[in-house]
Amino acid sequence: MGFSGSRAWSKWLTICLAITHPFSVTAKSAADYYVHSLPGQPEGPLLKMHAGHIEISPETSGNLFFWHFENRHIADKPRTVVWLNGGPGCSSEDGALMEIGPYRLIDKETLNYTEGSWDEFANLLFVDQPVGTGFSYGSTEHYVHELDEMASQFVTFLEKWFEIFPHYEPDDLYFAGESYAGQYIPYIARAVLDRNKKQDVQANNRIWNLKGLLIGNGWISPQHQYPAYLPYVYQEGVVQAGTQEANLIEAKAAKCMKELNVEDTTGTVHIPDCEDILQAILDYTHKGKRCINMYDIRLTDDYSACGMNWPPDLRDIQPYLRRKDVVKALHINEEKQTGWTECAGAVGSSLKARNSKPAVELLPGLLEEGLPILLFSGQKDLICNHVGTEDMIKNMKWSGGTGFELSPGVWAPRQDWTFEGEPAGIYQQARNLTYVLFYNASHMVPFDYPRRSRDMLDKFLGVDITHIGGDPADSRIDGEKGPTTSVGAHPNSTAAAEREKEKLNTAAWKAYYKSGEVALVIVAIAAFAWGIFIWRSRRKHQSSGYRSIYPMLGLNSTGSLGQISHKHSRRNGDIEAADFDETELDDQPSQAFLSRSSRDGDAYAVGEEGSDEEDGASDGQQPMFDQSRGEEGRS
């Protein structure tokens, strides 16, 4: 081609790379989030996982962290359960590593499988939210203050998550969580349903199939749950009525009732005068250096932690999630994270919901729109006790009835639930609402009873293993066996395996298409530049043609770009989808090539260790509880 032609080609190539560089840096695919190995993992094949940050607010560097586990088996259809812990400001890695996830820590370095984990027939998506919680990060000046802000932030996250993982978007979608997630989940559900009604969403056929909500020991209705503290501790014998201390607690309860006795409930999600009731109860139980555990009244804890040091797994989780190899495996942005903490006091101090109504006011509308909701309670939890939840249900009106009325004055019966021959709890249901009371369980029901909680989940999701295989669990309601469920690992039937294979093959092409959109732009720009160059070359060197550039590009004499593209398309499609063959990973470009640049800055944090006391004092109030567990302590 000659020196001038070579120089021209080099110039055009430089221009193309300059134009396409921003796209190649910022675009991410599923491959960037794939967890290749997990430190301390048990023997056996690694579960299919993705983890990392998704930017939801570039202007504030707001990023939410997620950890996704693909279901081990598919029953009759694909389902995704999104799990949120509460706080506000407490990490959903509590749920991942202590409750419903497939792994639990034996010690600071070793993981073990959990029998009864929720990923048997459902994909699990754990999200640290809102911004500032757990591994999530962003400008501290832009932490959310209201519940509708939180819900909007989360919908943005889901939009972006489904762009990267489009093969999960058609799944039946469920939101689950506990404690302050009783505020999060109804607000998020409302935002999702409103989103689905928008014309542009319907036109693009991107409606999310929201199928149900599960809330455990939820903080949902302060109007019913604050006043329930006294009846609960009297009923459980924690406080003796008529004593001087009991009279003091009753005086605080009376003061709280004045705060609650208002027509406009805006701003009543968190009431300091009402929080004093719980603190007075804990003070009453203070004996020596011990006090009752507010999350499990059968236990005690150091005063004034009173449950903040529980569960015992906590002492292993923080060191594990701060290990450099774990941080790397989960694709944590090392420039931003300053060490995982269970609860971020700054998030709780910011999210006071002073202009938000309690989530209980959203429940009737959600139920009337046909959305099934399951509320479950651990019998021995004090902070979000079952007496308050039951009182809330009793007084809630929806679909032409009050509480669990089947008809005027006729209530749905409380049905006895037995699991593997032992009394497990009570079921009660009517008009899309189900309530489950777990006997002898704490604030974190799945921590105590993972297999029973999985049985509850499978019943709610409608999983029936009759045509799948496996040993059924002996679970009965009023002595009757319902759909056959299983809470142990088992093989799928051939038919189910074929359905899963077909789903994953489809997923591969969808993910390839999504991640290839940016590549298409790059190819189009390069093709345009190529065309201009060829046109100019033909004019200048019409006699010699342009074959001489082939060796430079590694092409054959046909000038076909398609052969290189075809050679790599299948392999790239596989790794960018969720369907991974780990033997293919050795053939992929280096991690340095796949890595993405990250912003630098000192104004962002992920709940620095030791910052909680400062966070708690930021609004001028002395926090009731140790900020390491969140101001309300409702994790």
Swiss-Prot record:
Active site, UniProt feature:
S179, D381, H443
Membrane topology summary: Single-pass type I membrane protein
Which family is it part of? Belongs to the peptidase S10 family.
GO terms of molecular function? serine-type carboxypeptidase activity
Query: Per the record, GO CC terms?
Result: membrane; trans-Golgi network
Disulphide bonds annotated for this chain are none
Task: List the InterPro entries.
Answer: AB_hydrolase_fold, Peptidase_S10
Which organism does this record belong to?
Answer: Paracoccidioides brasiliensis (strain Pb18)
Q: What is the lineage of its organism?
A: Eukaryota, Fungi, Dikarya, Ascomycota, Pezizomycotina
List all topological domains (Cytoplasmic): 536-635
Which protein is depicted?
Pheromone-processing carboxypeptidase KEX1
Q: Which sequence ranges are marked TM in the entry?
A: 515-535
Q: Which PANTHER family match?
A: PHEROMONE-PROCESSING CARBOXYPEPTIDASE KEX1, SERINE PROTEASE FAMILY S10 SERINE CARBOXYPEPTIDASE
Enzyme nomenclature, EC number? 3.4.16.6
List keywords of the entry alphabetically: Apoptosis, Carboxypeptidase, Glycoprotein, Golgi apparatus, Hydrolase, Membrane, Protease, Signal, Transmembrane, Transmembrane helix
Q: Which Pfam families match?
A: Peptidase_S10
Lumenal topological segments: 28-514
The enzyme's first-digit EC class, named in words, is hydrolase
Where is the protein situated, by its record's location annotation? Golgi apparatus, trans-Golgi network membrane
Which residue ranges have biased composition labelled Polar residues? Answer: 483-495
**Can you cite a GO biological process for this protein?**
apoptotic process
Q: What does this protein do?
A: Protease with a carboxypeptidase B-like function involved in the C-terminal processing of the lysine and arginine residues from protein precursors. Promotes cell fusion and is involved in the programmed cell death.
Q: Where is the signal peptide?
A: 1-27
Q: Where do the record's glycosylation annotations fall on this chain?
A: N112, N432, N440, N492
Q: Reaction(s) catalyzed by this protein?
A: Preferential release of a C-terminal arginine or lysine residue
Disordered: annotated span? 472-497, 583-635
